[in-house]
Amino acid sequence: DSPAWLKSMERIFQSEERECRWMFGGCTTDSDCCEHLGCRWEKPSWCAWDGTVRK
């Protein structure tokens, strides 16, 4: 069994989200952009609001 401190570290790394691009940040796909943003396909590509809102 793992020590308590190791288990807490595992939880921290599992819950950590990947870095994302903010509004107007450069992108190549929608997954590059933060939540509620999508990659605008016209060049130059940048993250723009996808029209959704948080509930």
Swiss-Prot record:
Signal peptide: none annotated. The keyword Calcium does not apply. The keyword Cytoplasm does not apply. Expressed by the venom gland. SUPFAM superfamilies: omega toxin-like. It is found in: Secreted. Transmembrane segments: none annotated. GO terms for cellular component: extracellular region. Keywords: Disulfide bond, Ion channel impairing toxin, Knottin, Secreted, Toxin. Disulfide bonds join C20-C34, C27-C39, C33-C47. Residues 1-19 form a propeptide. One of its GO terms (molecular function) is ion channel inhibitor activity. It comes from the Eukaryota. Probable ion channel inhibitor. Belongs to the neurotoxin 10 (Hwtx-1) family. 06 (F4b) subfamily. The presence of a 'disulfide through disulfide knot' structurally defines this protein as a knottin. This is U2-theraphotoxin-Cg1a. It comes from Chilobrachys guangxiensis.
